[in-house]
Amino acid sequence: MISSTTGQEMTSREMLGYYLNKSYADAAAAKERGELICWSSSIAPNEFCEAMGIHVIYPENHAAAVAAKGGALDLLEVAEKKGYSIDLCSYARINLAYMDVQNCVAENIPLPDFVIVCNNICNTLLKWYENICTTLHIPMILIDVPFNYEDEISERSLDYIADQFVNAIRQMEEITGKKFDYDKFDKAMEISRESVYWWTTAMGKASALPSPLNG
């Protein structure tokens, strides 16, 4: 991809910034058109939203962008004045404060019509997203992932999560008022599988000496 400012091929970092800003701009335009916006935790089945034509925003990423641009402190103070403890995750506090002020040093994002959260990352997420829903009076779709004590995943756990996926699709159909598009879902899954392959391949290069990756 060619940069509009330099006229040269974009670096991977520049492309990442371009597509991130584009996703926020596309979501804002969609909100103005009356389309649905979903706030999602970083590891949740966003392929469901893609199948339903729902625009997805990741509050954790947005909070990190705010902090990277030096805007965290102002929002953290807003959150603390609202009664959120300083012991809470700063991502959560930044996002919960942003809901009030709806303005920040990073790209502004539209408020959600519903949220989808998967609790396989941290315990904070569940209460964070419950607060979003309570404040905005919107529905929450929860994917509850059981803790895995062994290397192998049990059939019981797989069945449990699969049942929740079925319920999540049913909830999305109720929220959107339309049927789930399985053709679009298959296409989204195809892209996801390819992305996983290339991500795994890229991460595998870290074993080389010298390593092309740091951190």
Predicted regions mapped to residue ranges:
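A charged, amphipathic alpha-helical module
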Residues: 1-36, 162-215
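A structural signal for short, well-ordered beta-strand segments and their strand-loop junctions
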Residues: 38-40, 56-59, 115-117, 139-144, ...
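An N-terminal, globular interaction/scaffold subdomain
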Residues: 39-108, 113, 120-121, 128-129
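Residues at alpha-helix termini
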Residues: 51, 134-135, 174
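Short glycine/serine/threonine/alanine-rich loop segments
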Residues: 54, 138, 178
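Low-complexity, flexible helical/coil segments
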Residues: 72-78, 92-97, 149-157, 174-181
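Acidic/His-rich segments in extracytoplasmic proteins that coordinate ligands and/or metal ions
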Residues: 96-170
